Structure formats: C-alpha cells, structure tokens
Amino acid sequence: MFNINPLENLKLYISSRPPLVVFMISVSAMAIAFLTLGYFFKIKEIKSPEMAEDWNTFLLRFNDLDLCVSENETLKHLTNDTAAPESTVTSGQARTSTQSPQPLEDAGPVNISVAITLTLDPLKPFGGYSRNVTHLYSTILGHQIGLSGREAQEEINITFTLPTSWSSDDCALHGHCEQVVFTACMTLTAHPGVFPVTVQPPHCVPDTYSNATLWYKIFTTARDANTKYAQDYNPFWCYKGAIGKVYHALNPKLTVIVPDDDRSLINLHLMHTSYFLFVMVITMFCYAVIKGRPSKLRQSNPEFCPEKVALADA
C-alpha cells in the first residue's frame, strides 16, 4: 500500500535539501514583489521617465532665486511701452499661427504668463516707494535656474505684474515695511527652446491683471543659490532693499504621466511573471510533500553500511 506522510516528507525534504529550500523562499519573495509592483502600477499614476522636465519642475527652478528690489532703483513710468515688440510673440499667438514653424535658430522670443506667488520681504532700512509700483522686472541667464547646454546662456526676461499697487503708504500705516505676499502674474520672455514642450500651466493676462491705470516698473537684480552660498558672497547684496522670492505650488495636471495603456501592459507582464514563479514554487512544494527524502543516500556517509545492516538483521 502506497502511504504518504506529507508533514514527515516535508521535514525530510527541508533537512536534506537546504539549498533548494532557500531557492524556493527566494522565488516566492520575488513572485510577491512582482505581484505587488504590478498592483502598484495599476492603481498609481507614474511620472513618465521619458520626459526629463515638465512645467512643474521648470517653475520650481525659480524658487531658488532671490530678487533684490533696491531702494535706490530708478522707477520707470510705463505708459506707451506696454505693448510687446514685433519680434516677440505670445504663446497664444504661437499656437494659433497657421504658418509653418520656423527653425529653432530663427525663432523669436516667446512670452508665457503664469500665475505665481511672490513674496517681498523688506529689510529694516527699506522705506518703500512713494509711487505706486505694479510691475517688477528682472533679467537672468539660464544657468541661474539650473539649465544646461545651449539654454544655459539664454537670457530670460521676467516681469511680475502685481494685482495691487505696492507703495510706501503701507509702510507708513504700520510704522515699518512689512512682508507682503502677492499672487502675481509672471511673464517669461525667452527663446522657445528654454521652455518645456509639455502641457503648459493656465495662463494669466498681464494687461488686465493690475487695476492701476498708471504703473511703474522697477528693475531688480537676481542671484541664484550657488551665488548665495559662494565664498565671495556679499552680505550687503540687497542693503536697503526688499528681497523677493517666488513660490510655485505643484500642479498635478502639469506632470507627464505614463499612459493607461502602458501601465496596463506593465501590470500584465508583471502579473504573468509572478504567476509563473508561483507555479514553480507550488510544483517544488508538491514534490517535497510527495517525494520527501531522496531514496538514494550519499555513499560518502560513514554511518551507512549495507553489510552492517544485513548482519544486524541476521
């Protein structure tokens, strides 16, 4: 009669074949890992590795900039130069143009306006401006926000349009100039190659963003994080001025994610791989339960001697 003792066979299999047991445990862990990873790809939106930079990462680069609004800076009264130059086109015009796209070398600068949070932190000696300031202007190079290659030497003109005017009246009201926070319209003017080619953030209209009829523009200087922490850093860089900081909140709609079809395909491959590994482990487990200890014992075992067994039985 064929008698199977599963528990005893399993114990004998574990004691006689430790390497195979370790292999089974490793394969089981790998199968569970593939199964978990496949489920993760199924329910989670994964950022596409093919797109190195989107508008979220691009706008976050400006968070490391410090803008100095100097008290000695000359106010420029702007009344007739608000229109963009003929060589400059807005992003909306670039999208609606029916002409064939120009080569990258011949393309003119592009204007893109996005809403951004701007904080102005006046230092103690700063007394504010008697005029109503509604626009801040600065020019930086691409390497100041971490761009590399040809874009590192490209100029980027930045114009902040404030929703309300900023003057010394607020300073007189509080006895000193306090930090102010604006949701400003930031207009970036640069070569098209500087900007990401992904989905753009919602645009704002600078001309209608400020309710001031007569406005003044302040030219500001900018420094990046490398300059700020360099050995030759000037502690009086923005003496008697206000330091401006830009903050961009992450917008999930701007992140380029892996398409649903690709995620489903990845999940399918991982599931098939995990099923195959599970079948392998189950097959080895069934073999251990049925077969147990190998029938042929090692001849090198000194305790095993057929002659001694025969004499003992006699």
Curated annotation (Swiss-Prot):
Gene giving rise to this polypeptide: TMEM248
Compartments reported by the entry: Membrane
Keywords: Membrane, Transmembrane, Transmembrane helix
Membrane topology term: Multi-pass membrane protein
Any GO CC annotation of this UniProt entry: membrane
Transmembrane regions listed in the UniProt entry: 21-41, 179-199, 236-258, 270-290
Span list, region Disordered: 79-107
Organism (species): Bos taurus
Family according to the record: Belongs to the TMEM248 family.
Ranges annotated as biased composition (Polar residues): 80-102
Protein name: Transmembrane protein 248
